Curated annotation (Swiss-Prot):
Transmembrane segments: none
Subcellular location: Cell inner membrane
GO CC, alphabetical: plasma membrane; proton-transporting ATP synthase complex
Protein name: ATP synthase gamma chain
Organism: Acidithiobacillus ferrooxidans (strain ATCC 23270 / DSM 14882 / CIP 104768 / NCIMB 8455) (Ferrobacillus ferrooxidans (strain ATCC 23270))
GO molecular function: ATP binding; proton-transporting ATP synthase activity, rotational mechanism
Matching InterPro entries: ATP_synth_F1_ATPase_gsu, ATP_synth_F1_gsu, ATP_synth_F1_gsu_CS
Length: 288
């Protein structure tokens, strides 16, 4: 058994670590609330664009954007969303596991993959595994803007429009609740042709375009793809802060239990030392 002095040092070290994890837990909780607010604020924008596209697609059934064209898959693209920092549990591990699994399935079918990656954690992992990266982005911070993400989005959209890839998957985490974040693989391109609901069809109206319809529809389609990726990034940020808060709370709780165990060991060591001293004194007195 370690002596009392060593145990006292361990207790001090664990208590200092617990102070750090408690502080990180509180910071993550604050950032999580702000990230959730941004996530909720962005949803209506993407939903409204989808709704407008549904109206326009119904009014102009002949319209087909290059990002909607379906063709046989010979090469795939991935837009992968991860975090810049760690200490967020298995959030990045789950996303990257989905990427590797999907790439392996495609490879078995003879389909190669190009990747655009957001976040240092994904970049480091995929570089080590020899993945073909065509775009990368890191350092978005806690308040990302759409303009910061245009590079990876355009890289994948342009590659699809030029026929360099035949399908693009968006891999990120979806926020279910504070305790649960689910890694998902969703098809980003080709965009499924928007359809109007029965209610929308009943209230269908025509639009007057200036100067003409196609540029408006083309721009809306680009904005829709951008909004889907932006929503995924800010939702992943909310997942990151939630996962970090839970991980730091778990670390703090474990540290508290460790301090309790060490305190018990310290008391036993101290009691054993006192008992030994008394025994030595008694033995010395008896010898005299």
């Amino acid at each position: 058994m370690a002596n009392a002095k060593e145990i006292r040092g361990q207790i001090k070290s664990v208590k200092n670590t617990r102070k750090i994890t408690r502080a990180m837990e509180m910071v993550a909780a604050s950032k999580m609330r702000r990230a959730q607010e941004r996530m909720r604020a962005a949803r209506p924008y993407a939903e409204k664009i989808r709704e407008v596209l549904g109206h326009l697609a119904q009014a102009h059934p002949e319209y087909e954007h290059p990002l909607m064209q379906v063709r046989p898959v010979k090469k795939a693209g991935f837009l992968v969303v991860t975090t810049d920092r760690g200490l967020c549990g298995g959030l990045n591990v789950n996303v990257l596991r989905n990427v590797v699994q999907k790439m392996r399935e495609l490879h078995e079918e003879g389909v190669e993959s190009n990747l655009a990656v957001v976040g240092n954690k994904g970049l480091g992992f995929l570089r080590r595994h020899g993945a073909h990266l065509v775009a990368e982005l890191n350092g978005l911070g806690d308040s990302p803007h759409l303009g910061d993400m245009i590079g990876p989005i355009r890289a994948m959209a342009d590659a699809y429009a030029k026929g360099e890839v035949d399908v693009v998957y968006l891999v990120s985490s979806r926020f279910v609740n504070t305790m649960l974040q689910r890694a998902t693989v969703e098809q980003l391109l080709p965009v499924e042709k928007p359809t109007a609901s029965a209610e929308q069809r009943a209230e269908l109206w025509d639009y007057i375009y200036e100067p003409e319809a196609r540029p408006v529809l083309d721009r809306l389609m680009q904005r829709y793809v951008e909004s889907v990726v932006y929503q995924a990034v800010i939702e992943h940020l909310a997942c990151e802060q939630s996962a970090r808060m839970v991980a730091m709370k778990s670390a703090s709780d474990n540290a508290k239990r460790m301090v309790d165990d060490l305190q018990l060991a310290y008391n036993k060591a101290r009691q054993a030392a006192i008992t030994q001293e008394i025994a030595e004194i008694s033995a010395g007195a008896a010898a005299v």
